[in-house]
């Protein structure tokens, strides 16, 4: 873990909290180049009616616009939740150097077919991965969000509103 990992993860957590305020799953991401944030993203799939509007994808898109290049060499992506398969694909193709995430994505194990999350050619460039940075803060944000959602759903279901 690098000295700056906690700082940049806290920036991603801030974005995740904004995502939650707009009714989205609280996930935030920042893309960093030379210790500077060049891309930010928060989940907005529901708001934008876009299944690809994940925090990671948005941070990568913003970073690519900033660098004027889709190849995001020598960058680090910080994200509050381990990326899904779609986001892993975008991360691999963007050629970032490093991925840092907070909470583990427990459902990902259902979909991975190869060791170490790499389901592509072994000769492809590898990405350094640092896991569970500020894990409890990231996990708590997600669990409290889903507890509230379940409580609301149960209330409506039990009162025959749905």
Swiss-Prot record:
EC number from the UniProt entry: 3.5.4.33
Keywords for this protein: Hydrolase, Metal-binding, tRNA processing, Zinc
Residues annotated as binding Zn(2+): 54, 84, 87
Cofactor requirements of the protein: Zn(2+)
Note on cofactor: Binds 1 zinc ion per subunit.
Reactions that this protein is recorded to catalyse: adenosine(34) in tRNA + H2O + H(+) = inosine(34) in tRNA + NH4(+)
UniProt superkingdom: Bacteria
First-level EC class: hydrolase
GO molecular function, one term: tRNA-specific adenosine-34 deaminase activity
Pfam families noted in UniProt: MafB19-deam
Domain called CMP/dCMP-type deaminase: residue spans: 3-115
Family label: Belongs to the cytidine and deoxycytidylate deaminase family.
Function according to Swiss-Prot or TrEMBL: Catalyzes the deamination of adenosine to inosine at the wobble position 34 of tRNA(Arg2).
Assembly description: Homodimer.
Name of the molecule in the record: tRNA-specific adenosine deaminase
Organism per entry: Buchnera aphidicola subsp. Baizongia pistaciae (strain Bp)
Source lineage: Bacteria, Pseudomonadati, Pseudomonadota, Gammaproteobacteria, Enterobacterales
């Amino acid at each position: 873990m690098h000295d700056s990992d906690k700082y940049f993860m806290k920036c991603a957590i801030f974005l995740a909290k904004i995502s939650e305020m707009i009714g989205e799953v609280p996930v935030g991401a920042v893309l960093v180049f030379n210790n500077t944030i060049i891309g930010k993203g928060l989940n907005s799939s529901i708001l934008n009616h876009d299944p690809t509007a994940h925090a990671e994808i948005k941070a990568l898109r913003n970073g690519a616009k900033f660098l004027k290049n889709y190849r995001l060499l020598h960058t680090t992506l910080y994200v509050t939740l381990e990326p899904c398969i779609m986001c892993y694909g975008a991360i691999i193709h963007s050629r970032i150097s490093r991925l840092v995430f907070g909470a583990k994505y427990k459902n990902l194990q259902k979909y991975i077919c190869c060791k170490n999350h790499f389901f592509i050619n072994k000769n492809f460039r590898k990405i350094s991965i640092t896991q569970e940075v500020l894990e409890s803060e990231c996990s708590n944000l997600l669990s409290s969000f889903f507890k509230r959602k379940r409580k609301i759903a149960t209330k409506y279901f039990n009162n025959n509103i749905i």
